[in-house]
């Protein structure tokens, strides 16, 4: 493993950011579970940003393993289903930690549900100190409470960590007025307001997450995680994306 901090090589727009990705982003074309080459590819995208000197927080969903709402829809008690989903996010966080550390990036998995033999408990001041030491912090187990999504967890942790923006990595290069994979005339927004996202149900994040970002003036940058170098490029003022703001 290499040194914990990487010197900044060029000017960047943000000093500290939250990267939110879905669990499905880790499964590649398999349809379920973890696809190690895909996890490694995403880790390399994070590595490129880390080399710029940016402090990185991450939240990863668990839908590639288990989704609480799905379990609830099939008759499982909602609270139990949500806790199972939270545990799935811990598995994904550990996989990403392993990939990042194989690239020489010191990484901490920090869980909202204590499991001391597996990862650290969430203590805000300790997490901030990790970031200051240029360690990547992956926040797992959502908020630790049922009925809250990992989108809401990402927005909550981004606010607590004083991140300057949330980067939402998706399958498309921004927010569209309709699904660009189904409609050739779909229009991409350069910028869009929090309220318009809520009113038009644009699917950026769930309503609670968008409202929390709006109330704290935290911009959301929606970009394609499949675009090589996309995450790093946006931080250098390049690339295609949508900015959600007030």
Swiss-Prot record:
Involved in allosteric activation by GTP: annotated span: 28-33
Stored InterPro entries: AceGlu_kinase-like_sf, Asp/Glu/Uridylate_kinase, Uridylate_kinase, Uridylate_kinase_bac
Known pathway: Pyrimidine metabolism; CTP biosynthesis via de novo pathway; UDP from UMP (UMPK route): step 1/1
EC number: 2.7.4.22
Residues in coiled coil: none
Free-text activity regulation comment from the record: Allosterically activated by GTP. Inhibited by UTP.
Positions contributing to ATP binding: 20-23, 63, 67, 170, 176, 179
Claim: Transferase is one of the keywords in the record: yes
GO terms for MF: ATP binding; UMP kinase activity
Membrane-crossing residue ranges in chain numbering: none
GO BP terms: 'de novo' CTP biosynthetic process; UDP biosynthetic process
Alphabetical list of SUPFAM superfamilies matching this protein: Carbamate kinase-like (SSF53633)
Catalytic activity, reaction form: UMP + ATP = UDP + ADP
This protein's record includes keyword Heme: no
Keywords, in A-Z order: Allosteric enzyme, ATP-binding, Cytoplasm, Kinase, Nucleotide-binding, Pyrimidine biosynthesis, Transferase
Residues bound to UMP: 62, 82, 143-150
Compartments where located: Cytoplasm
One cellular component term from this protein's GO annotations in UniProt: cytoplasm
Task performed by this protein: Catalyzes the reversible phosphorylation of UMP to UDP.
NCBIfam families according to UniProt: pyrH_bact
Subunit structure: Homohexamer.
Protein family (similarity comment): Belongs to the UMP kinase family.
Protein name: Uridylate kinase
């Amino acid at each position: 493993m290499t040194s914990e901090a990487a010197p900044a090589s060029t000017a960047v727009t943000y000093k500290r950011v939250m990267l939110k990705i879905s669990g499905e982003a880790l499964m590649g074309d398999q349809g379920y579970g973890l696809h190690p080459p895909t996890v490694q590819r995403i880790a390399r995208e994070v590595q490129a940003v880390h080399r710029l000197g940016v402090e990185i927080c991450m939240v990863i969903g668990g839908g590639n393993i288990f989704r609480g709402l799905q379990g609830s829809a099939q008759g499982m008690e909602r609270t139990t289903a949500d806790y199972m989903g939270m545990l799935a996010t811990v598995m994904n966080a550990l996989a990403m930690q392993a990939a990042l550390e194989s690239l020489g990036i010191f990484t901490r998995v920090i869980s909202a549900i204590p499991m001391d033999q597996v990862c650290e408990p969430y203590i805000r001041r300790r997490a901030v100190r990790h970031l200051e030491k240029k360690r990547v912090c992956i926040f797992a187990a959502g908020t630790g409470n049922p009925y809250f999504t990992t989108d809401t967890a990402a927005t909550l942790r981004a606010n607590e960590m004083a991140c300057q923006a949330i980067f939402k990595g998706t399958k498309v290069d921004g927010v569209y007025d309709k699904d660009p994979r189904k409609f050739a005339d779909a229009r991409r927004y350069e910028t869009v307001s929090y309220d318009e996202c809520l009113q038009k149900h644009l699917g950026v994040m769930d309503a609670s997450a968008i409202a929390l970002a709006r109330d704290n003036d935290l911009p959301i940058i929606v970009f394609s995680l499949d675009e090589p170098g996309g995450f790093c490029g946006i931080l250098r003022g390049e690339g295609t994306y949508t900015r959600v703001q007030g």
